[in-house]
Amino acid sequence: MEKQYLTVTALTRYIKTKIEYDPHLQSVWLKGEISNFKNHSRGHMYFTLKDENARIAAVMFAGHNRNIKFRPENGMKVLVKGKISVYEASGSYQIYIQDMQPDGIGNLHLAYEQLKVRLEEEGLFSQVYKKTIPPYAKTIGVITSPTGAAIRDIITTIKRRYPIGNVIVFPVLVQGESAAPSIVQAIRTANEMEEIDVLIVGRGGGSIEELWAFNEEMVARAIFKSEIPIISAVGHETDFTIADFVADLRAPTPTAAAELAAPNIIELQEKVLQRTLRLQRAMRELVHKKEEKLQVLQKSYAFRYPRQVYEQKEEQLDRALEQLVLAKERYIDKKVNQLKQLSFYLEKHHPSQKIMQTKVAVETLQKQLQREMQTLLQTKEFAFVRAAQKLEALSPLKVMMRGYGLVYDEEKQVLKSVKDVSLGDAVSVQLQDGILDCSVSGIEERELNNGK
């Protein structure tokens, strides 16, 4: 019988078919530890599930993982549900996960803690970014369900405390998958309206699942970016959501949020009354002081004897006018004297006088320079004549005219001693009127006394 060889592809597909048709492998529950976690840009998750003795490749496509609330991380222990199949390209089997939750802690609780840590590290909870709630808001925006008890409590409280205030309700979903986008859109819409002074964002109490929209990251970031101050009012006093940490002010209940947003008109009226009374009291005191001052003035000499006061002032005015005239005359005399002194100074230091003096000085210096140059020239001419006479007396030609000559060897070097030549050497003798070419035929050494 001839053997039939399978291709690798055929064998792999056979094994894959066997696995996929096994009902025990199409609904598998596993628990293990995540490692080699990778979140693909397209949203798919790839990682390994392992325990102490084995490991299996795992895939969770974007269509399934978008529903999980927490972020898978390496080292996290999880419970997963999925099916086993074969990845033909590598011939390896792996689990395709359809659902996943943390092992030992609730899915939502883990997601809550993870987001809380991450946003706190980013600074979204910092007091630096908290906006001040206006004390007298004219218009209050309310973002909540239009049918819940929270909206009734908020509106009732605002109308009771601050009936002159305006309330604008932005109806939203407060639970379910569409709740978070609904809340985010309402916050954006409110920020586009200039008349809103403060926003209340919240709902009544409920389970963590029912309150989860206020733990969504998109809601937290929308609250943080809001230009309008936001008061969070989610659930009961013991409920804390991510929205509470990001909001500018947290109220334990919707009713408390309304009390924080709306001032108490009775208290305001009391304040107005107190300030009115203080103002009236201050005005009475001021009028009383002015009346006392008026009475003092009425009793003064000026009010009792106005004619005498007038005459005194007339006399003081006359004296003041006389002093003014005298002061004017003294001032004019002073300025005239200053003008005379200045004119004398200018005349004395006029440029024409300075130019004339400078011209005379220059002419004097020119004459002095000419005299000194003439004297120097004569001195130099006399010194030149004497130097010329000395040079002429020392000239070799003068010496030759007295019968002397210069003797040169064959190399045209002047002979100064008979020791510089030998018998038969050719020499030349320069006289005043020519040169003699000679030959040494004899040498006699002797010393001359006084040139003889």
Curated annotation (Swiss-Prot):
It holds the Pfam family tRNA_anti_2. It catalyses: Exonucleolytic cleavage in either 5'- to 3'- or 3'- to 5'-direction to yield nucleoside 5'-phosphates. Its EC number is 3.1.11.6. Heterooligomer composed of large and small subunits. Bidirectionally degrades single-stranded DNA into large acid-insoluble oligonucleotides, which are then degraded further into small acid-soluble oligonucleotides. Belongs to the XseA family. This is Exodeoxyribonuclease 7 large subunit. It comes from Bacillus thuringiensis (strain Al Hakam). The lineage of its organism: Bacteria, Bacillati, Bacillota, Bacilli, Bacillales. The gene is xseA.
